[in-house]
């Protein structure tokens, strides 16, 4: 992976420890930063957006986790007592949970300490299948074919009641600290799903039953932090969980990364988390978020606003004001792809007829990706050729496809060929049946979105296609997209692990309204998706991945636009931070705040 790290101070962040005095015990180490989009809540089975998941990943604990500073994609035990046992046919997985792990105190436990048990993971998994919660991640797990789970869900759909106490053949507690999954089909990469606490964090049944529909506002977990303040869409405060387990850092660092090796040596043997408090603000506009960081109101900048790139990194080098403040800068390829979605159920832009396919492919050809990267991303992105993401299995950096092309002439010829021509004396094209062709674009009310809107409108104007915009905040647009109440909307898709299956679900028919927001449904694609999910990595799987990419490009339910670079910044007193693959918000537990250095720096 192409990665560079700029340390503007001549001393490496980890080396600052030796010169810094120990902070007074009464001083709480606090990490402050801002998110660009508001959270939606904190219930693992109800949330989908990465901003909420970033918070949830620090409150709850999954059995496994991706290892910080290890070779990207390495999985290690978290609450699990060793790695789970996997059968040779990839159908049976047995987890053993460490004893003596406790949930944070909550009135739901009636004053008693509540130990984490295997039953909590079984209950949490079953919640995904409970129709009452309408979980957006249900389809992710339905495809694994856990024996008996689908029957339990279907019974609940008929009766209106989900029976959590009903025994399930494929999901059992073998004893207080052991649970087992049995699948109907092989799943070689099944364990990776249990390395994401925002998906598979354990939730206590008593808490869900106490708070009911209010569970989104009452997260109670076993993770390193707990939520102590929440002002919806404005700010959050999390503090160290006083009941957190004895979590000692030890990892074999990535042998190809000297910086990771140095930090790993410094962290080795330390008890996590290292900080006491995390304060998060929601600042949606780029410039205020950038100025908040420059003014010292935040210690860390999570993804520098790309429209500030010219100011922050002129000619690719840190600006003098950043150098003077000894700010750490890290720029790495983000494991993501940005997409323009088309609702395949929409009567104007959706459908599988040659005319509708031609319309979507023409719009895709009209996108000026170079202009998008220059104007919108400020050169902090590179063109996407397909759904495959850098850093994920199957990504081919040499691949070139129609998706990566820009040709207004070809796009216009395609529209002409399939009957999208002006019929009413204006420049604007009409549908083949003569009705007006208008593309409705969903967007958000912030400055960055307005820049994107101008590019999208310029694309359609060049094709003589009329458009209008539907403006609402991200959570509302997301709800509308899940319900299929939109025509076109753009967003980014990030990978949660090295397996491409989750990303490929963007085109998987049964996931329509969840991962598959375009609502694309094609039997051939669905069959390939299931097959690739059941076989080990190798030539056969790679061929299936290539064929699935080709189908998405041919039918064009979406346009794959770009893979972004992420630029993170931190003041020199933030120690041990690296933007590590698949370890996103989980980094809280690994970073430290050098109170002495911070005090000395702010005095000058």
Regions found by a protein language model. Give the residues of each.
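Bacterial N-terminal signal peptides
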Residues: 9-18
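Active-site-proximal polar cores
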Residues: 561
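Cleaved targeting-peptide boundary
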Residues: 25-31
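N-terminal lobe/hinge region of extracytoplasmic solute-binding protein
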Residues: 34-88, 220
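Non-catalytic accessory/assembly modules
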Residues: 116, 137-160, 164-194, 198, ...
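Extracytoplasmic/periplasmic ligand-capture domains
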Residues: 68-69, 84, 92-94, 98-135, ...
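Sec/Tat signal peptide C-region and signal peptidase I cleavage site
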Residues: 19-25
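Bacterial N-terminal signal peptides that target proteins for export
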Residues: 1-10
